[in-house]
Protein backbone atom coordinates (compact mmCIF):
# COMPACT_ATOMS: atom_id res chain seq x y z
CA UNK A 1 0.00 0.00 0.00
CA UNK A 2 1.05 3.59 -0.60
CA UNK A 3 0.63 6.54 1.73
CA UNK A 4 1.11 10.28 1.87
CA UNK A 5 2.09 11.56 5.30
CA UNK A 6 2.97 14.80 7.05
CA UNK A 7 3.83 15.44 10.68
CA UNK A 8 4.24 18.49 12.87
CA UNK A 9 5.25 19.18 16.46
CA UNK A 10 5.46 22.50 18.32
CA UNK A 11 6.37 23.38 21.88
CA UNK A 12 3.37 25.73 22.16
CA UNK A 13 3.35 29.13 23.84
CA UNK A 14 3.41 28.27 27.54
CA UNK A 15 5.82 25.34 27.86
CA UNK A 16 9.61 25.57 27.80
CA UNK A 17 10.20 21.94 26.76
CA UNK A 18 8.46 19.91 24.07
CA UNK A 19 7.66 16.61 25.79
CA UNK A 20 5.89 15.18 22.72
CA UNK A 21 7.53 12.74 20.31
CA UNK A 22 6.37 11.55 16.92
CA UNK A 23 7.28 8.49 14.88
CA UNK A 24 6.75 8.16 11.13
CA UNK A 25 7.67 5.17 8.97
CA UNK A 26 5.38 5.23 5.95
CA UNK A 27 7.39 2.53 4.17
CA UNK A 28 6.46 0.11 6.95
CA UNK A 29 3.01 1.60 7.44
CA UNK A 30 3.63 2.55 11.07
CA UNK A 31 3.09 5.89 12.83
CA UNK A 32 2.78 7.13 16.42
CA UNK A 33 2.45 10.15 18.70
CA UNK A 34 3.51 10.16 22.36
CA UNK A 35 2.92 12.89 24.96
CA UNK A 36 5.30 12.70 27.92
CA UNK A 37 4.99 13.87 31.52
CA UNK A 38 7.23 14.01 34.55
CA UNK A 39 8.79 17.46 34.80
CA UNK A 40 12.05 18.93 33.53
CA UNK A 41 13.16 16.65 30.69
CA UNK A 42 11.63 13.45 32.12
CA UNK A 43 8.52 13.62 29.93
CA UNK A 44 10.61 14.30 26.86
CA UNK A 45 12.70 11.24 27.68
CA UNK A 46 9.61 9.07 28.26
CA UNK A 47 7.95 9.90 24.95
CA UNK A 48 11.26 9.45 23.11
CA UNK A 49 11.70 6.01 24.70
CA UNK A 50 8.31 4.99 23.31
CA UNK A 51 9.00 6.16 19.77
CA UNK A 52 12.50 4.64 19.87
CA UNK A 53 10.99 1.30 20.94
CA UNK A 54 8.53 1.40 18.04
CA UNK A 55 11.34 2.28 15.65
CA UNK A 56 13.15 -0.90 16.70
CA UNK A 57 10.20 -3.24 16.11
CA UNK A 58 10.94 -6.18 13.82
CA UNK A 59 9.53 -5.80 10.33
CA UNK A 60 6.36 -7.86 9.84
CA UNK A 61 3.69 -7.94 7.15
CA UNK A 62 1.21 -9.34 9.69
CA UNK A 63 -0.72 -6.54 11.40
CA UNK A 64 -1.64 -8.60 14.45
CA UNK A 65 2.00 -9.54 14.91
CA UNK A 66 2.98 -5.89 14.58
CA UNK A 67 0.42 -4.90 17.21
CA UNK A 68 1.58 -7.67 19.54
CA UNK A 69 5.21 -6.65 19.10
CA UNK A 70 4.29 -3.02 19.77
CA UNK A 71 2.50 -3.93 23.00
CA UNK A 72 5.45 -5.97 24.23
CA UNK A 73 7.85 -3.15 23.38
CA UNK A 74 5.66 -0.71 25.30
CA UNK A 75 5.48 -3.13 28.22
CA UNK A 76 9.27 -3.04 28.48
CA UNK A 77 9.30 0.76 28.29
CA UNK A 78 6.70 0.76 31.08
CA UNK A 79 9.07 -1.26 33.28
CA UNK A 80 12.02 0.95 32.41
CA UNK A 81 10.15 4.17 33.20
CA UNK A 82 9.00 2.87 36.57
CA UNK A 83 12.59 2.06 37.47
CA UNK A 84 13.76 5.48 36.31
CA UNK A 85 11.13 7.18 38.45
CA UNK A 86 12.24 5.14 41.46
CA UNK A 87 15.82 6.27 40.91
CA UNK A 88 14.72 9.88 41.37
CA UNK A 89 14.70 11.04 37.75
CA UNK A 90 11.24 12.62 38.13
CA UNK A 91 10.29 15.56 40.32
CA UNK A 92 6.71 14.25 40.48
CA UNK A 93 7.59 10.64 41.30
CA UNK A 94 6.24 9.41 37.97
CA UNK A 95 7.73 9.40 34.50
CA UNK A 96 5.08 8.55 31.96
CA UNK A 97 3.79 9.11 28.48
CA UNK A 98 0.69 8.57 26.43
CA UNK A 99 0.97 6.80 23.12
CA UNK A 100 -1.26 6.35 20.12
CA UNK A 101 -0.01 4.22 17.25
CA UNK A 102 -1.32 3.17 13.86
CA UNK A 103 -0.27 0.30 11.60
CA UNK A 104 -1.72 -0.26 8.11
CA UNK A 105 -1.24 -3.15 5.67
CA UNK A 106 -3.28 -5.08 3.11
CA UNK A 107 -6.40 -2.97 3.41
CA UNK A 108 -6.63 -3.09 7.20
CA UNK A 109 -5.42 -1.09 10.19
CA UNK A 110 -4.60 -1.67 13.82
CA UNK A 111 -4.64 1.22 16.27
CA UNK A 112 -3.15 0.88 19.77
CA UNK A 113 -3.06 3.43 22.55
CA UNK A 114 -2.72 4.35 26.21
CA UNK A 115 -3.85 7.73 27.52
CA UNK A 116 -5.61 10.60 25.78
CA UNK A 117 -3.59 11.08 22.61
CA UNK A 118 -6.11 10.35 19.88
CA UNK A 119 -6.55 8.65 16.54
CA UNK A 120 -9.19 9.87 14.09
CA UNK A 121 -10.39 8.52 10.76
CA UNK A 122 -11.81 10.88 8.16
CA UNK A 123 -13.68 9.08 5.39
CA UNK A 124 -15.89 10.71 2.75
CA UNK A 125 -16.16 13.91 4.76
CA UNK A 126 -17.11 12.20 8.02
CA UNK A 127 -14.84 12.08 11.07
CA UNK A 128 -14.81 9.34 13.68
CA UNK A 129 -12.63 8.71 16.69
CA UNK A 130 -10.75 5.46 16.38
CA UNK A 131 -9.43 5.62 19.94
CA UNK A 132 -11.23 6.21 23.23
CA UNK A 133 -9.53 8.48 25.76
CA UNK A 134 -8.23 6.81 28.89
CA UNK A 135 -9.22 9.74 31.08
CA UNK A 136 -11.41 10.63 34.01
CA UNK A 137 -13.66 12.88 31.95
CA UNK A 138 -14.16 10.19 29.30
CA UNK A 139 -15.23 7.79 32.05
CA UNK A 140 -17.71 10.43 33.27
CA UNK A 141 -19.04 10.90 29.73
CA UNK A 142 -19.44 7.14 29.28
CA UNK A 143 -21.31 6.95 32.59
CA UNK A 144 -23.71 9.70 31.50
CA UNK A 145 -22.45 12.05 34.20
CA UNK A 146 -20.90 14.60 31.85
CA UNK A 147 -21.85 15.93 28.44
CA UNK A 148 -19.22 15.35 25.72
CA UNK A 149 -19.00 19.06 24.94
CA UNK A 150 -18.17 19.77 28.60
CA UNK A 151 -15.30 17.30 28.78
CA UNK A 152 -12.58 19.45 27.20
CA UNK A 153 -13.14 22.35 29.63
CA UNK A 154 -13.73 20.25 32.76
CA UNK A 155 -11.42 21.02 35.70
CA UNK A 156 -10.11 17.44 35.59
CA UNK A 157 -9.71 17.24 31.82
CA UNK A 158 -5.99 16.60 32.19
CA UNK A 159 -6.33 13.52 34.42
CA UNK A 160 -5.59 10.36 32.48
CA UNK A 161 -6.27 6.85 33.75
CA UNK A 162 -3.62 5.01 31.74
CA UNK A 163 -0.11 5.84 30.58
CA UNK A 164 3.12 4.06 29.79
CA UNK A 165 5.16 4.25 33.01
CA UNK A 166 2.26 5.16 35.29
CA UNK A 167 1.79 1.77 37.00
CA UNK A 168 2.96 -1.83 36.92
CA UNK A 169 -0.54 -2.83 35.84
CA UNK A 170 -0.36 -2.44 32.08
CA UNK A 171 -3.08 -2.55 29.44
CA UNK A 172 -3.00 -1.29 25.87
CA UNK A 173 -6.23 -1.00 23.89
CA UNK A 174 -6.20 -2.19 20.29
CA UNK A 175 -8.88 -1.76 17.62
CA UNK A 176 -8.94 -2.94 14.04
CA UNK A 177 -10.73 -1.90 10.89
CA UNK A 178 -10.59 -1.62 7.12
CA UNK A 179 -8.96 1.12 5.10
CA UNK A 180 -9.97 2.57 1.75
CA UNK A 181 -8.21 4.81 -0.75
CA UNK A 182 -8.77 8.41 0.28
CA UNK A 183 -8.98 7.67 4.00
CA UNK A 184 -7.20 10.16 6.25
CA UNK A 185 -5.90 9.15 9.67
CA UNK A 186 -4.95 11.79 12.23
CA UNK A 187 -2.87 10.99 15.30
CA UNK A 188 -2.63 13.87 17.76
CA UNK A 189 -1.62 14.85 21.27
CA UNK A 190 -4.14 16.61 23.46
CA UNK A 191 -2.41 19.90 22.75
CA UNK A 192 -4.35 19.80 19.48
CA UNK A 193 -7.56 18.04 20.45
CA UNK A 194 -8.31 20.21 23.48
CA UNK A 195 -8.07 23.33 21.35
CA UNK A 196 -9.70 22.24 18.08
CA UNK A 197 -13.05 20.50 17.85
CA UNK A 198 -13.76 17.48 15.69
CA UNK A 199 -15.71 19.46 13.08
CA UNK A 200 -12.76 21.82 12.68
CA UNK A 201 -10.39 18.91 12.17
CA UNK A 202 -12.52 17.33 9.46
CA UNK A 203 -12.82 20.70 7.70
CA UNK A 204 -9.02 20.87 7.50
CA UNK A 205 -8.64 17.28 6.29
CA UNK A 206 -11.49 17.19 3.78
CA UNK A 207 -9.63 18.28 0.67
CA UNK A 208 -6.52 20.35 0.05
CA UNK A 209 -2.93 19.41 0.71
CA UNK A 210 -1.85 17.56 3.83
CA UNK A 211 0.94 20.05 4.46
CA UNK A 212 -1.49 22.96 4.38
CA UNK A 213 -3.87 21.12 6.70
CA UNK A 214 -1.10 20.38 9.19
CA UNK A 215 0.22 23.94 9.10
CA UNK A 216 -3.29 25.36 9.50
CA UNK A 217 -3.90 23.17 12.56
CA UNK A 218 -0.70 24.36 14.22
CA UNK A 219 -1.49 27.99 13.39
CA UNK A 220 -5.01 27.64 14.81
CA UNK A 221 -3.69 26.21 18.06
CA UNK A 222 -1.09 28.99 18.33
CA UNK A 223 -3.73 31.64 17.66
CA UNK A 224 -5.74 30.23 20.57
CA UNK A 225 -2.89 30.41 23.05
CA UNK A 226 -1.28 26.96 22.60
CA UNK A 227 -1.24 26.08 26.32
CA UNK A 228 0.46 22.73 25.71
CA UNK A 229 2.84 21.06 23.30
CA UNK A 230 1.03 20.09 20.11
CA UNK A 231 1.90 17.20 17.80
CA UNK A 232 0.13 15.55 14.90
CA UNK A 233 0.65 12.98 12.18
CA UNK A 234 -1.66 12.91 9.15
CA UNK A 235 -1.62 9.83 6.92
CA UNK A 236 -3.60 9.55 3.70
CA UNK A 237 -4.20 6.17 2.08
CA UNK A 238 -3.52 6.45 -1.65
Feature map (PLM): residue ranges:
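PP2C/PPM-type serine/threonine phosphatase catalytic domain
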Residues: 1-238
